[in-house]
Regions:
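Repeated loop/turn-to-beta-strand initiation elements of outer-membrane beta-barrel proteins
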Residues: 18, 58-60, 114, 159-162
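Transmembrane beta-strands of outer-membrane beta-barrel proteins
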Residues: 6-12, 60-64, 100-102, 118-124, ...
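Predominantly the C-terminal beta-signal and adjacent terminal strand-loop region
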Residues: 158-211
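Outer-membrane beta-barrel strand-turn architecture
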Residues: 2, 52-56, 108-114, 155-157, ...
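Transmembrane beta-strands of outer-membrane beta-barrel pores
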Residues: 14-18, 66-70, 110, 124-130, ...
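Short glycine/proline- and aromatic-enriched beta-strand/turn motifs that initiate or cap beta-hairpins
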Residues: 1-42, 203, 209-211
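Flexible, solvent-exposed loop segments that connect beta-strands
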Residues: 22-37, 70-95, 131-140, 176-196
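Residues that define the transmembrane beta-barrel architecture of outer-membrane proteins
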Residues: 4-6, 40-44, 96-100, 116, ...
Length: 211
């Protein structure tokens, strides 16, 4: 299989999605709010693999992947006290995420040892999120671009390769949609967005490629 110019496969896996959060640190009604990403909740991923052999150790891979998951942001007041009618302390807001990644990766493989072959992978691509609800407190922009890197190992079976792989993905863009671009947003929900200056995507994926 490693000697084929092109081969195909599919992937199944788990994802852990979140944000890198930057606060505004601007007082809102006399209180400063801080946001952080809560513990990452696992989601699932499914994708398709196209692999082009460039050399003995180098491959170019196209792996469009659809992810299902949820991101949760927790808000805390600087004083540690809730503000009546606005935000509570330790209040959580969930954002439904249904993104598709369209990446290109370079895969560098070591020499095969018996029935396994470790590798490193790096690349980037486009990210489009089908999730989100404009009526919710937090609404993110659809398009983003990212870089990713990781490692894995080809495990050779009789008829296919099983390739467990772990990757870390970092988005470039500020995906937060400001209140000024959301005229339909309820006033009581605007505080959640106004407390944030910047949101960038991040994701850890554990995938199993069948090739």
């Amino acid at each position: 299989m490693d000697d084929k110019l092109i081969h195909f496969g599919f992937s199944l896996g788990l994802n852990f999605m979140g944000y890198n959060v930057t606060d505004t640190n601007t007082p809102i009604d006399g209180e400063v709010y801080h946001a952080r990403v809560s513990s990452l909740m696992p989601g699932c991923s499914v994708g398709f693999v196209t692999d082009l052999r460039l050399s003995r150790h180098l491959n170019l891979r196209f792996t469009p992947t659809l992810h299902f998951g949820e991101k949760t942001i927790t808000y805390k007041t600087e004083s540690g006290k809730p503000v009546e009618g606005i935000l509570g302390n330790n209040e959580k807001v969930s954002v439904l995420a249904l993104p598709i990644d369209i990446p290109l990766y370079l895969k560098w493989s070591a020499e095969r040892e018996k029935n396994y072959r470790p590798y490193l992978i790096a690349g980037g691509g486009a990210h489009y999120d089908f999730g989100g609800d404009k009526e919710k407190p937090i609404y993110t922009k659809k398009w983003d671009f990212f870089v990713a890197f990781g490692l894995g190992c080809d495990l050779y079976m009789s008829w296919f390769k099983l390739c467990p792989e772990i990757r870390y993905q970092i988005g470039f863009n500020n995906v937060l949609t400001p209140v000024t671009d959301r005229p339909q947003l309820a006033v009581q929900n605007a505080f959640y967005t106004n407390a944030l200056q910047r949101l960038t995507n991040q994701m850890i994926t554990l995938t199993f490629n069948f090739e």
